[in-house]
Every structure is written in structure tokens, then in C-alpha cells.
């Protein structure tokens, strides 16, 4: 009985040893290994080629600074944004070139052009007669077209003002017509207005501001906002208490 068991065990072991080996156990250099190597190399080459093509179609993302500079340098604005504009102010101008300064005794009037965003400027005389040489202003002021990058909005927050605007593949600049005191004095006591009786009144000249609607940046979108700009130089008078 034991002899028969030994014979069956030996026959079973011989059968296992004589069975063909699988591809996983094929030694290197055999045909099966060569086929697997060729297939692996082909897949690797195809993967590299696909990755290279993907990189060409989807280039590596730029740095945040480069993206920010690019967006600021060339901001494209939808023309429909200007069609919805309300509360237009003559102190806000979009132009491809610096606007001329208004001369004394003249005011600036803007003419809208439907074809382009640029506005032509014409000067016309005031309705009131020309000042005589003996007439003087209470406070001396100066006016000029300026470019603003930041401003305070109607809520008191600092906002970014758009400078260059790309509309219909043409770059425009946003100008603001500001008026301020010519020689502002930080000490109101030593800055008296012209023609005010100093025996009864303390007076000084100061620059006042008003709100105009300007094109600003809100995140990555352009939007209209009310911002403050200098618009006049006025005289402030205070009655002296010593006279009571």
C-alpha cells in the first residue's frame, strides 16, 4: 500500500516538472519576453507622444504675476457696457490721446460719437460776459486732465480705476477733469480768501470733491462705480467769536 502511494506521488511530481512554464516565468531573452518588451516600449513611446501633444495643446500655466500683468495691460471691454451707462459726467473722458486743456473764460463740452468711444472736445464761451480786469476770484484754482489708478468710491472703499481699455481692438485711456486750489495751505488760519474782511471772519480756501461715474475693476470684471474726484476750490468762512 505504501509502495503504491510513493509511486503516485513521484508520478505527480514528474508531471508538474514537465508542464510548460507560463509567460510570467519565462527567462529574459525568450520570445515571450521580447514580445512583452516590445509592447511595453511601444506603449511607453505612445504615452510620451500623447503627453507631448497634450502639453502643446495645453501649455503649462503661467505664474500669477504674469497673468496679472497681462490682464492689466490689455483689458478688453464689451461695447455693450457703454450702452448701459447712466449718469454720464463731462468730467470723465475716454480718449486715444491726451485731451486739450480748457482755456480761461471757456468751458469744455463733450460731443458723443456713436461710432467710436472717443469724444471730440469743443470749447465755447460762457453765457456770462467776459470778466473785467478788476474782477478776481475769491480762491485761485487750477484744472487739468489727470489719470487715476485708485480712488475712493461712494461707500468709502478704495477701488482700482481702469486706465487702459481695449474696445474694438483699440486702446483708450480714461481721463478725469479735476479742479483744485492752486496753492493749498495746510494751515487754514494763514490761508485767507481774497476779499473777505479778516476783522469779522476767518477764511481759507479748500478743495471740494464730488462723485462721478467711472469704469473700475471689480475682481476680473469691469463695472461702473461712483468715485470721488476734485472738482472745485471754494472759500470757507468762520465768524470770529471775539466780536460778540
UniProtKB/Swiss-Prot annotation:
Disulfide links within the chain: 139-205, 181-233, 193-235
Tissue-level expression: Expressed by the venom gland.
GO BP field: cell surface receptor protein tyrosine kinase signaling pathway; modulation of chemical synaptic transmission; negative regulation of neuron apoptotic process; nerve development; nerve growth factor signaling pathway; neuron projection morphogenesis
Residue ranges that the Swiss-Prot or TrEMBL entry lists as coiled coil: none
Prodomain residues: 19-125
GO cellular component, one term: dendrite
Residue numbers spanned by region Disordered: 47-67
Primary location recorded for the protein, binned into one broad class: secreted
Signal peptide: 1-18
Keyword Signal attached: yes
Keywords annotated in UniProt: Cleavage on pair of basic residues, Disulfide bond, Growth factor, Lipid-binding, Metalloenzyme inhibitor, Metalloprotease inhibitor, Protease inhibitor, Secreted, Signal, Toxin
InterPro entries for this protein: Cystine-knot_cytokine, Nerve_growth_factor-like, Nerve_growth_factor-rel, Nerve_growth_factor_bsu, Nerve_growth_factor_CS, Venom_nerve_growth_factor
Protein localization: Secreted
GO MF term (any one): metalloendopeptidase inhibitor activity
Ranges annotated as biased composition (Basic and acidic residues): 47-66
Summary of the function given for this chain in its UniProt record: Nerve growth factor is important for the development and maintenance of the sympathetic and sensory nervous systems. It stimulates division and differentiation of sympathetic and embryonic sensory neurons as well as basal forebrain cholinergic neurons in the brain. Its relevance in the snake venom is not clear. However, it has been shown to inhibit metalloproteinase-dependent proteolysis of platelet glycoprotein Ib alpha, suggesting a metalloproteinase inhibition to prevent metalloprotease autodigestion and/or protection against prey proteases.
Self-association state and partner proteins as the record states: Homodimer; non-covalently linked.
Protein family membership: Belongs to the NGF-beta family.
Protein name in the entry: Venom nerve growth factor 1
Amino acid at each position: 500500500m505504501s509502495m503504491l502511494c510513493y509511486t503516485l506521488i513521484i508520478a505527480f511530481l514528474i508531471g508538474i516538472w514537465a508542464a510548460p512554464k507560463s509567460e510570467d516565468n519565462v527567462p529574459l531573452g525568450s520570445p515571450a519576453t521580447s514580445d512583452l518588451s516590445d509592447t511595453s516600449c511601444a506603449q511607453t513611446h505612445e504615452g510620451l507622444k500623447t503627453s507631448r501633444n497634450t502639453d502643446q495643446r495645453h501649455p503649462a500655466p503661467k505664474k500669477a504675476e504674469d497673468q496679472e500683468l497681462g490682464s492689466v495691460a490689455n483689458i478688453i471691454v464689451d461695447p455693450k457696457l457703454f450702452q448701459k451707462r447712466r449718469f454720464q459726467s463731462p468730467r470723465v473722458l475716454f480718449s486715444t490721446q491726451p485731451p486739450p486743456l480748457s482755456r480761461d473764460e471757456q468751458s469744455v463740452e463733450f460731443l458723443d460719437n456713436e461710432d467710436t468711444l472717443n469724444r471730440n472736445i469743443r470749447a465755447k464761451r460762457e453765457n456770462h460776459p467776459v470778466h473785467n480786469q478788476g474782477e478776481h476770484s475769491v480762491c485761485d484754482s487750477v484744472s487739468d486732465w489727470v489719470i487715476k489708478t485708485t480712488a475712493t468710491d461712494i461707500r468709502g472703499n478704495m477701488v482700482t480705476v481702469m486706465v487702459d481699455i481695449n474696445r474694438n481692438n483699440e486702446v483708450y485711456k480714461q481721463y478725469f477733469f479735476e479742479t483744485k486750489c492752486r496753492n493749498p495751505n495746510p494751515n487754514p488760519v494763514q490761508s485767507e480768501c481774497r476779499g473777505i474782511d479778516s476783522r469779522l471772519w476767518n477764511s481759507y480756501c479748500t478743495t471740494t470733491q464730488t462723485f462721478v461715474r467711472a469704469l473700475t475693476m471689480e475682481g476680473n470684471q469691469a463695472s461702473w462705480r461712483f468715485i470721488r474726484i476734485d472738482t472745485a476750490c471754494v472759500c470757507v468762512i468762520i465768524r470770529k467769536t471775539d466780536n460778540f
